[in-house]
């Protein structure tokens, strides 16, 4: 009988204390963010450089772009040009006015083999890779109008 009375009392205490429980905010709020990516992550560096028109001769270097590809064991590292940066088999930097173009060649500086296919520049061999991609003037372009020009390359992998 005592045991039954104790159990009943405990149930009442739990029911009464549960009915009055509540959350009162009294601090800061934290946020957890997660970005889920492909296993093969290809990071493309930024390059900002100034050149005079007279320096835009055929094969003149515009500059190096760093590329770091990790987790690409069974994939071919690739860089894709924005649609505004590729036409008829050629890469180019586009002016801020979206009219003027500065044609360029893209090639690795380590003599590894790469291929261009419809605006995608990809490594012929599979596997992670880190190195420098050189951007070079394609043809004599000393008459290029002054202004700001941009080439946007997105890192990824090539899938046949």
UniProtKB/Swiss-Prot annotation:
Domain of life: Bacteria
Location within or outside the cell: Fimbrium
Coiled-coil residue spans: none
First and last residue of the signal peptide: 1-21
Cysteine pairs bridged by disulfides in the record: none
One Gene Ontology cellular component: pilus
UniProt xrefs under InterPro entries: Adhesin_Dr, Adhesin_Dr_signal_peptide, Adhesion_dom_sf, Dr_adhesin_sf
Region annotation (Receptor-binding) ranges: 22-75
Keywords (A to Z) from UniProt: Fimbrium, Signal
Family: Belongs to the Dr-adhesin family.
UniProt function note: Hemagglutinins of uropathogenic E.coli mediate adherence to the upper urinary tract. These adhesins bind to the Dr blood group antigen and also agglutinate human erythrocytes in the presence of D-mannose (mannose-resistant hemagglutination (MRHA)).
Protein's name according to its UniProt entry: Dr hemagglutinin structural subunit
Organism: Escherichia coli
